[in-house]
Amino acid sequence: KKKGIPAVPCLPVIYAENPITAGNEKIMAKEMDLSGYPYVLEQAEEVEEAYLEKIRCRLLGLPCEILQTKRCIVREICLADVDNLYEIYADPSITLYMEGLYAKKEEEIAYTRDYIRYQYGIYDFGMWIIEDGQSGEVIGRAGLDLRPDREDAELGYMIRKNRQGQGLAYEVCTAILAYAKEELGFEKLFARTRKENLASVMLLKKLGFHPVCAQSETKEADNAQIEYYIALS
């Protein structure tokens, strides 16, 4: 509290057949309501500095840093990023192959607030912000999304217009693939792009993705998406 960190319930728990209490510890019976405790660890060894730092950021409403590359920082989105995203998405080329933002900024802010709370809070991953490692400028987004009908996650990426063609998407996505395997435990990922989006197609192939099938979203063949997958072996 002295450092501005909100207080949250904390209770050491030990499992036993018969529920008793001893000092500050709770001996856990077969059933126990833990709904008031936002973080539950099964082993004391799981309490590592990096994990505690992530909890600190969550409680203070700060974006957690996910990873760094040679030129970029990948971190969670925060509400302060919304204005930067509207500036980036104002270029028509950005929304040529992907969905745009809400027309009303207050709706985008509300969506972002819920995304931070539920997507990051529950799954611990999602679409992240890409920052220039030197200037701190927001230069794009990249990350992993879940689909209701899929167990594997979808890789997504976007680099602002004036920073495209510099190899940044490849640099960041390569690091995200490693993170997905080593930190999140994914065995494979998929990605979708339109066949006429040649830059995206080339990026996926360079990353090691393989085409699966064409999936038409509309009756026009030019709007068909190609699905790619990669095994994280």
Predicted regions, residues:
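Acyl-donor (CoA/ACP) binding surface of acyl/acetyltransferases
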Residues: K2, A7-C10, N18-D83, E87-L96, ...
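A short helix-loop-beta-strand connector motif used in the catalytic cores of GNAT acetyltransferases and
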Residues: Y115-I129, G140
